[in-house]
Amino acid sequence: MNIIDELEWRGAVNQQTDEEGLRKLVEEKKISLYCGVDPTGDSMHIGHLIPFMMMKRFQLAGHHPVILIGGATGTIGDPSGRQSERQLQTLEVVQHNVDALTAQMKKLFDFGGNSEVKMVNNYDWTHEINIIEFLRDYGKNFSINSMLAKDIVASRLDTGISFTEFTYQILQAMDFHHLYKKEDVQLQIGGSDQWGNITSGLDLIRKLEGHEAKVFGLTIPLLLKSDGTKFGKSAGGAVWLDPEKTTPFEFYQFWVNTDDRDVVKYLKYFTFLTKERIDELAVKVETEPHKREAQKVLAEEMTKFVHGEEALLQAVKITAALFSGDIKSLTADEIEQGFKEMPTFQSSKETKNIVEWLVDLGIEPSRRQAREDINNGAISMNGEKVTDVGTDVTVENSFDGRFIIIRKGKKNYSLVKLG
């Protein structure tokens, strides 16, 4: 199947400006296409990842992706999907975010050697345009009537929209025109909320370059979970690509915990597995859901893609240790990842009796209860049961002098930080 057929099979096509024309174009030649992201933060989350997964598919099919980081548009703010104005960021913050997103993109796409992938920053060409040029060369080609009719603007008319955000669609259209002229880009990909911005770009190119210009737009559907909520959030909030914000272990766990009703859809959307392999996993979901094989494959594929093989192996190791309770083989860094969301306590490094120590920290409510739990085998320290109420807790008990893990009962873990 060609790339458009594959995207449709994967459920990744929402709207196309000219399905027949685009299908014919990609069958005739390898095209250049682009997708952009504004540096509104210093990390993408997995919701941002969706259109770039489609760009990666085009790359693997031999096409030439252009990744746009919005160093200019990021200073303005995209009104799409918002009910209120964005808070303007300083140029210093925007540049910091540009650098961070650029580094993330370099991990996802191969920019080395003879790679056909390019990364551009729209600040490089936008900052040279003065206000007179903007109004004469570009503004003249936009009708206020058509701009007001765009969903991204119409939805804000009651609550209000600034002239700054109102002109965002012109800036994005300018990007498409610039890339069409300089990089021969013929297709823009974006989320479903970008339809108005994309069609503005098509209109501008045709007005400036002639109606025979072969340019196209394609949007990705809004991805919803089976319960109707928006994809991309965990109980702790957004799932980030930055390992400092969402650890590889947490990232892995997010995918492992995917609902049976969603997992096949996610395998199609997010992995590069073949149709045959995904069909096999779909059968396993129906016949052996308790094994959660599809979820494990999804988690492995995504963690490896975003964080690499080493981080995946670490996440799998932490998961296995937590499941079995055998945590002795974990390193201090793995402990920090795996127990990040557990109840956390602070302790000095001085030697102390286990009973006194548990009560002082607040893990046990009283000395009597602490002694009773120890005598009943309900207390484990770093994966080993504590059986003697006379046991002393020392730095030697810790992981690298930093952490001690207490388990009370079967599943109640506590992380104790020494310092």
Curated annotation (Swiss-Prot):
Q: Which UniProt keywords apply?
A: Aminoacyl-tRNA synthetase, ATP-binding, Cytoplasm, Ligase, Nucleotide-binding, Protein biosynthesis, RNA-binding
Q: A GO biological process this protein is involved in?
A: tyrosyl-tRNA aminoacylation
Task: Tell me the domain of life.
Answer: Bacteria
Family classification: Belongs to the class-I aminoacyl-tRNA synthetase family. TyrS type 1 subfamily.
Protein name (record): Tyrosine--tRNA ligase 2
Q: Where is this motif: 'KMSKS' region?
A: 230-234
Could you tell me which NCBIfam families the record lists for this protein?
tyrS
Q: Tell me, what is one Gene Ontology molecular-function annotation carried by this entry?
A: RNA binding
Question: Which top EC class is named for this enzyme in its record?
Answer: ligase
Q: Where is this motif: 'HIGH' region?
A: 39-48
Give the record's subunit note: Homodimer.
Give the subcellular location.
Cytoplasm
- Assigned EC number: 6.1.1.1
PANTHER family with a match to the protein in the record: TYROSINE--TRNA LIGASE, MITOCHONDRIAL, TYROSYL-TRNA SYNTHETASE
Q: Which residues bind L-tyrosine?
A: Y34, Y168, Q172
Q: Which InterPro entries match?
A: aa-tRNA-synth_I_CS, aa-tRNA-synth_Ic, Rossmann-like_a/b/a_fold, S4_RNA-bd, S4_RNA-bd_sf, SYY-like_C, Tyr-tRNA-ligase, Tyr-tRNA-ligase_bac-type
Instruction: Give me the segments passing through the membrane.
Output: none
PROSITE patterns per the UniProt record, alphabetical:
AA_TRNA_LIGASE_I (PS00178), S4 (PS50889)
Q: Which terms in the GO cellular component ontology are assigned?
A: cytosol
Species for this entry: Bacillus cereus (strain ZK / E33L)
- List the Pfam families: SYY_C-terminal, tRNA-synt_1b
Residues reported in the UniProt entry to bind ATP? K233
Primary localization class, coarse? cytoplasm
Gene3D superfamilies reported for this sequence = HUPs, RNA-binding S4 domain, Tyrosyl-Transfer RNA Synthetase
Name the reaction it catalyses.
tRNA(Tyr) + L-tyrosine + ATP = L-tyrosyl-tRNA(Tyr) + AMP + diphosphate + H(+)
Source gene? tyrS2
